[in-house]
């Protein structure tokens, strides 16, 4: 699978509207037309690798299948702002 900046943009927009920093979010909860939960999860892994999303919930089991996150980081908001302004 490849990095998909358009899908990443849609995920960040979704997160901006739906994440409150308290609730656990995973790919199956994010509904984006034309994207499967597996495709969304892959992009979430990339966002997590770059510290653009963060998980601040309960401790997860090491074998957790999906990426969990609770909010965007400041870096995540910076990227979202840049993507909204087409400066990337």
Model-derived regions, located:
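Short amphipathic alpha-helical interface segments
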Residues: 2-32
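Short loop/turn motifs at secondary-structure junctions and domain boundaries
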Residues: 60-63
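Short amphipathic alpha-helical interaction segments
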Residues: 33-54, 66-67
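Residue-level detector of well-ordered alpha-helical segments, enriched
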Residues: 3, 7, 39-43, 68, ...
